[in-house]
Amino acid sequence: MGGFIANPAFQFDNHSIVELTHQSRFAGMVNSDYVGFRKEIRKNVPVHFSILYEGIGKIPDTRSMLLDWGADGVFGTQDSGEGNGIIDEGERLNVDSIKYFSQHIFGLHGAFNKAWHQWQVGIGTKLLLHFIDDHHAIGIGLDLGFFRHFNGFNFGFVLRNIPSSGILWENGTIEGTLPNIDLGFNVPINMINYGLEFNPILSIRVNPYNRSLDSDIGFGTMSIDTVIGMECKYDNNLAVRIGRNPLGTMVGGIGISWKRISMDYGFLSEDSNSGLGNHHLITLGFSPDWLVEKVSR
């Protein structure tokens, strides 16, 4: 169900599955959780909800560490170097002045889609609550997704943050996010005699306003980044996945699924130059009816 965040136009065969996901990043410094489920707001009008949380604890606040007393080592004399915010000769840091704070982000995503001609069209709405130290903010956003099966392959694209998204802080500051476009291609290759299915995937992200040094292709302010991946499924129960994210880092995963329960594990290797540790993601999907049946025995 997390696919509805990627493209609200996606449709899945089994709509009764609840998904629970936990992700640990940077060797456990950042932890994220996800819950996804389907709810009919009225007959034959399902909305796919996603609840997300991300927390970062013990973020050091070093702003008061510097003993910025200047060359004479005495506060209040206004000598050379005092109060300039730079560690000058004779000054030092006071480790006892380190303070710690945390960051918490809560998100709610709702996706709704309908058939339109030969396309599946979906709308995704986003609500974000952001808390960092004693500051807080609220954000909203809108995505528009399209998906279609062609002869032998699948194609989808998403217009993100249209017309734009924004986060409003309690002091009136607004963080704006300009629109971008994601395109995805998938060509299923079936080897029925062997029970195998291969799913090569190509995703292209076009951002007209946010070119960076890490961009695969850049034109002026525009950046184009690519994601490639391959999924191999055996007997529709066992899946092995490998790919490359927009930063060029290799990712991989394995999944096991049955009719009413599934388990997945994802892994993102550490950038050899960062020293920040690996990322791990674990997902459990289950049917609520199956869970009630097991508990009531």
Task: Enumerate the language-model features and the residues they cover.
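Subset of outer-membrane beta-barrel
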Residues: 1-297
